[in-house]
């Protein structure tokens, strides 16, 4: 217990998994913690110490469950064979398992990244280093303080390392529920960071990475390297990390957290399900690496036309050649997750199955490279061919030395084939010959003793033995030594059998020891090639994702969009990719043109497709910037710098923000940051306040965005806004068409030019199941109000002054009768009182009393 407490005192923030033989044991408070967290049985030792344990072969699953609940696990292993220990077995911490440092296959999800992040704020800029230990990813980012939420949403961070004094960052991280690791400020020192980076990448200056030695981001990068070394208990744990790349924000279209959620890129708003998301539609990658890259590309669209068109050219080759696409995808389907295998090699967590999977995957490199022909694929083909040449010796080494169906763990032995290592062959020969020797020996002693029922056997507890029935026991010779007494038999050992047993058991140990040594040497050879393996993994991921784009395009009828520098948007027969897949041939496509009039006001009934329309335009624009083809008959997309959305508030009541407050905060972000090159979609601004306030805000917001000149789709239920198109050439009106027939309406889901002045809300209420008497009464009230409010509404909007004089806006708002009507409690009125009140309103609205 003294040894245990020493390790526990050194890592008080962790639950300590303490290896004792075939189990990991937890004691005292740790035992109570795991018992409560994951339901392990709590027991006590003789001295009253609480304890709990898990079998070593199942420990990874328990560790994962602990980490998922926010705990950190320190793993303390036996560093020597207990049989050779003269006192307490030597032990040591071999790794610390945290949310951002997972490397074992059982702890990770194939299609999701697991990013570790370090942050430091300097002059209102947050410097960020991002690493993924399991794949070797290493990137540097800079974001403004007010854009931290967006960065967290876009990157999908599992754990953040931050200085203890970074209150602003800490509060944001805690709000997101991300695992937080606080470190003293000196861990982020730029001088120490520069030294670590130079040592890691073998350079004398960091200028080749686009950063200076004293840049604050260097300290952040150093902090993440130091943390990886601590958690993996090795300075070799980050040998596979790529050289740090500084990500320039101008290279990517900016998507804030609201946009990623609103467009349902990764998961749906309702249910938080991946099924029904954009990623769900686009996911036809064959490799785990491709699946992770696809998610990254969808959240980080390209902003440079040349980079987009380079991707498009490759997608087009695959789209036009079904045979090539099929061949490549079949080859990719055989490639294992070599990026994460490389990570496990670097961290010492690699298994025999990993090694064999790596060898098989590397052999496919040649085949894939040979299939890639043509100008568009030339650079990928050349790079893959170069990597194949470099990695071929390693692939041959692995496949020639290892069996095709390897054991799960090296402790089981049996990984290597016969014939390539003489020492291993000799040990195995002794094991194989054991069966024949035992058979011969049994025949010999049966003949010598004349005991026909005598048998030679083996079990793990007693080893080898000679078994004789009780009835024949008095006939055994003197050189038989009794070893075990059974109910109906006696078991013996002889000097010859004991000598044989020692030789066989020694051979088993020799074979396993030799295999473990050979495995270590093989892993060392893999480590020498690790940077080429990581480069190969990157190329495979890119190729897989581009082939995936082509596969989706051909499967669902997507086209290559034209990318232009001018701020225009022309989409013919555009479709929402998710609904198009779900509804198949029943989805109604629509055009969108935002050129001379970049702001379109869209009116029409509820449930008629306004929200779907504006979302599909945003998603088509996003897909075009990833290099993918798009769901349309044709499309010309002008480059955008940002995509903004305001398409339905999610209440943030826990943060003290109402639905309307969230709506206004998100709208403020758009108004303060949108540029002429942005795309903005707005859905029903102003619903969370009074009619007059909402209309006023919507009007002013539309005018402001018109002034910016950004491409905007503004869906609204305020029909008064359509008057803006009469006075502002930047604004045009669109509406969703319906067909009226026998007092019923049919939604056509078609977008057409012009305005509409009806919302058909009562019809929507009817089909939603509102009782008939309520629907009938609503129609009566609507007919009365429509007649008397139409003139007042038209007059009010016609008198609204241009934007510079908006201080006079409220003098010309629609009739105050609307506000008075909203204050009436209908249930408190008798029929006669209601009639009299309606007649009074009628008289006033008609101008008999006041105009």
Predicted feature locations:
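Active-site phosphate-binding and catalytic loops of NTP-dependent enzymes
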Residues: 76, 99-108, 235, 376-380, ...
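ATPase nucleotide-binding head domains, primarily ABC-like/P-loop NTPase cores
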Residues: 28-31, 214, 286, 297, ...
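Amphipathic heptad-repeat alpha-helical coiled-coil/stalk segments that mediate oligomerization
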Residues: 188-196, 203, 253-259, 265, ...
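Charged, surface-exposed helical/loop "interaction arms" that form contiguous linear patches used
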Residues: 347, 351, 364, 379, ...
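C-terminal tails and terminal domains of large nucleic-acid-associated
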Residues: 814-851
């Amino acid at each position: 217990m003294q040894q245990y407490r020493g390790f526990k005192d050194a890592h008080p923030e962790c639950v300590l998994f303490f290896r004792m033989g075939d189990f990991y044991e937890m004691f005292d408070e740790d035992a109570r913690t795991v018992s409560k967290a994951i339901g392990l049985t709590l027991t006590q030792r003789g001295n009253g110490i609480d304890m709990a344990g898990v079998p070593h072969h199942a420990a990874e699953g328990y560790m994962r469950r602990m980490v998922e609940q926010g705990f950190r696990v320190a793993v303390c292993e036996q560093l020597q064979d207990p049989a050779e220990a003269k006192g307490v077995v030597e032990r040591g911490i071999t790794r610390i398992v945290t949310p951002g440092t997972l490397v074992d296959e059982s702890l990770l999800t194939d299609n999701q990244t697991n990013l570790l992040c370090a942050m430091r704020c300097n002059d209102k800029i947050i410097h960020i280093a991002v690493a993924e230990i399991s794949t070797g990813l290493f990137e540097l980012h800079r974001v403004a303080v007010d854009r931290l939420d967006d960065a967290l949403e876009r990157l999908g961070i599992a754990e953040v390392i931050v200085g203890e004094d970074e209150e602003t960052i800490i509060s944001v991280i805690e709000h997101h529920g991300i695992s937080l690791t606080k470190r003293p400020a000196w861990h982020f020192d730029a001088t120490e960071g520069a030294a670590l980076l130079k040592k890691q990448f073998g350079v004398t200056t960091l200028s080749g990475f686009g950063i200076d030695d004293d840049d604050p981001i260097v300290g952040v990068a150093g902090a993440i390297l130091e943390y990886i070394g601590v958690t993996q208990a090795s300075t070799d744990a980050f040998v596979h990390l790529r050289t740090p790349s500084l990500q320039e924000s101008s290279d990517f279209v900016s998507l804030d957290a609201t946009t990623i959620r609103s467009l349902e890129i990764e998961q749906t708003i309702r249910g938080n399900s991946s099924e029904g998301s954009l990623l769900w539609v686009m996911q036809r990658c064959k490799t785990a690496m491709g699946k992770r890259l696809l998610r990254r590309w969808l959240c980080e669209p390209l902003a440079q036309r040349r980079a987009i068109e380079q991707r498009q050219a490759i997608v087009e080759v695959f789209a036009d050649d079904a045979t090539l696409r099929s061949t490549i995808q079949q080859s990719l389907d055989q490639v294992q997750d070599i990026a994460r295998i490389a990570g496990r090699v670097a961290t010492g967590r690699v298994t025999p199955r990993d090694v064999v999977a790596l060898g098989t995957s590397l052999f496919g490199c040649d085949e894939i490279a040979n299939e890639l022909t043509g100008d568009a694929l030339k650079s990928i083909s050349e790079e893959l061919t170069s990597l194949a040449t470099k990695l071929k010796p390693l692939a041959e080494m692995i496949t020639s030395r290892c069996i095709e169906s390897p054991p799960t763990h090296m402790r089981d032995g049996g990984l290597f084939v016969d014939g390539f290592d003489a020492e291993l062959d000799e040990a195995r020969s002794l094991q194989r010959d054991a069966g024949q020797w035992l058979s011969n020996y049994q025949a010999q002693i049966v003949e010598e003793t004349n005991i026909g029922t005598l048998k030679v056997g083996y079990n793990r507890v007693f080893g080898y033995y000679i078994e004789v029935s009780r009835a024949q026991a008095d006939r055994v010779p003197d050189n038989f030594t009794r070893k075990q007494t059974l109910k109906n038999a006696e078991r013996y050992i002889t000097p010859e059998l004991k000598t044989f047993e020692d030789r066989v058991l020694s051979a088993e140990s020799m074979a396993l020891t030799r295999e473990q040594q050979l495995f270590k040497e093989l892993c060392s050879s893999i480590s020498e090639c690790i940077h080429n393996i990581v480069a190969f993994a990157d190329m495979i991921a890119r190729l897989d994702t581009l082939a995936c784009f082509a596969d989706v395009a051909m499967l669902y009828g997507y086209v290559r969009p034209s990318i232009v520098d001018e701020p225009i948007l022309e989409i013919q027969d555009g479709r929402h990719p998710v609904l198009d897949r779900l509804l198949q041939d029943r989805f109604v496509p629509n055009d969108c043109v935002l050129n001379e009039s970049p702001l379109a006001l869209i009116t029409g009934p509820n449930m008629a497709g306004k929200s779907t329309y504006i979302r599909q335009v945003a998603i088509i624009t996003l897909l075009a910037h990833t290099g993918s083809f798009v769901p349309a008959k044709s499309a010309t997309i002008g480059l955008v710098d940002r995509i903004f959305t305001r398409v339905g508030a999610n209440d943030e009541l826990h943060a003290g923000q109402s639905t309307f407050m969230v709506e206004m905060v998100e709208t403020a972000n758009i108004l303060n940051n949108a540029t002429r090159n942005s795309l903005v979609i707005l859905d029903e601004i102003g619903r969370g306040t009074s009619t007059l306030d909402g209309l006023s805000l919507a009007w002013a917001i539309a005018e402001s965005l018109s002034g910016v000149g950004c491409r905007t789709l503004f869906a609204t239920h305020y029909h008064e806004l359509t008057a803006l198109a009469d006075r502002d050439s930047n604004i045009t009106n669109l509406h969703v068409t319906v067909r009226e027939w026998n007092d019923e309406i049919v939604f056509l889901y078609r977008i057409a030019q012009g305005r509409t002045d009806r919302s058909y809300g009562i019809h929507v209420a009817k089909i939603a199941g509102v009782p008939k008497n309520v629907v009938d009464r609503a129609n009566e009230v609507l007919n009365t109000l429509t007649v008397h409010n139409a003139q007042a509404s038209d007059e009010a909007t016609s008198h609204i002054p241009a934007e510079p004089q908006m201080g006079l806006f409220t003098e010309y708002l629609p009739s105050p009768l609307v506000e008075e009507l909203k204050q009436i409690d209908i249930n408190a009125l008798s029929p006669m009182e209601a009639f009299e009140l309606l007649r009074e309103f009628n008289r006033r609205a008609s101008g008999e009393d006041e105009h």
